[in-house]
Amino acid sequence: MQSAMFLAVQHDCVPMDKSAGNGPKVEEKREKMKRTLLKDWKTRLSYFLQNSSAPGKPKTGKKSKQQTFIKPSPEEAQLWAEAFDELLASKYGLAAFRAFLKSEFCEENIEFWLACEDFKKTKSPQKLSSKARKIYTDFIEKEAPKEINIDFQTKSLIAQNIQEATSGCFTTAQKRVYSLMENNSYPRFLESEFYQDLCKKPQITTEPHAT
């Protein structure tokens, strides 16, 4: 059981490449794409933070407080290293983590986790059923557009559960994805330029007095 989980963790964020083994060109293309994404991470992070500061508010042509880029303080960013839950509980931390996962081509994990959080809050049986099917088609079924890396047994159990959807349909899968992120993506995030930049305190420079 433990070795199976280790293998799952090792494969977190690694896309299922059907052309695996086709050589350097595939790897070179992936590395080039990754470098491009990493190069503009600040722009993407700014977008996430700006939008997370004004949820549900439409953009207008006028400048407003909601449209101002708000960067979390270094002290707030440092709190995210205390626990994975601290990161997820912060809207800025969550936005930064999503931007980081996007640069690593594995944002489907956090998107699935967030979809499950929303799903568990759903009260209407009709909405519960429709959301369950959407989560299944988006993340669970074979070759889903955002397919997550979970075992066949869990997938089969979910396929049965969504026939009569309850708030616990995706509990097992959500816990496994959470564990994958906590043990793999989260440590890499804390070591990344993404995070280190946010933790830096601005340097105060003083101009020399005129003589």
Swiss-Prot record:
Positions of region (Necessary for membrane association): 32-66
Residue spans crossing the bilayer: none
Coiled-coil portions: none
Key words of the record: Cell cycle, Cell membrane, Cytoplasm, GTPase activation, Membrane, Nucleus, Phosphoprotein, Signal transduction inhibitor, Translation regulation
SUPFAM superfamilies assigned to the protein according to its UniProt record, in alphabetical order: Regulator of G-protein signaling, RGS (SSF48097)
Gene Ontology terms for molecular function: adenylate cyclase inhibitor activity; beta-tubulin binding; G-protein alpha-subunit binding; GTPase activator activity
Knockout mutant characteristics: Mutant mice display increased blood pressure and impaired relaxation of vascular smooth muscle.
An annotated GO cellular component: nucleolus
Modifications after synthesis and translation: Phosphorylated by protein kinase C. Phosphorylation by PRKG1 leads to activation of RGS2 activity.
Gene: Rgs2
Protein's UniProt keywords contain Cell membrane: yes
Keyword Electron transport: no
Stretches for region Necessary to inhibit protein synthesis: 79-116
Protein name: Regulator of G-protein signaling 2
InterPro entries: RGS, RGS2_RGS, RGS_sf, RGS_subdom1/3, RGS_subdomain_2
Assembly mode: Interacts with GNAQ. Does not interact with GNAI1 and GNAI3. Interacts with EIF2B5. Interacts with PRKG1 (isoform alpha).
Main function: Regulates G protein-coupled receptor signaling cascades. Inhibits signal transduction by increasing the GTPase activity of G protein alpha subunits, thereby driving them into their inactive GDP-bound form. It is involved in the negative regulation of the angiotensin-activated signaling pathway. Plays a role in the regulation of blood pressure in response to signaling via G protein-coupled receptors and GNAQ. Plays a role in regulating the constriction and relaxation of vascular smooth muscle. Binds EIF2B5 and blocks its activity, thereby inhibiting the translation of mRNA into protein.
A Pfam family that the UniProt record links to this protein: RGS
CDD domains: RGS_RGS2
Tissue and organ distribution: Expressed in a wide variety of tissues.
One GO BP annotation of this record: brown fat cell differentiation
Location within or outside the cell: Cell membrane; Cytoplasm; Nucleus, Nucleolus
UniProt source species: Mus musculus (Mouse)
UniProt domain RGS: residue ranges: 83-199
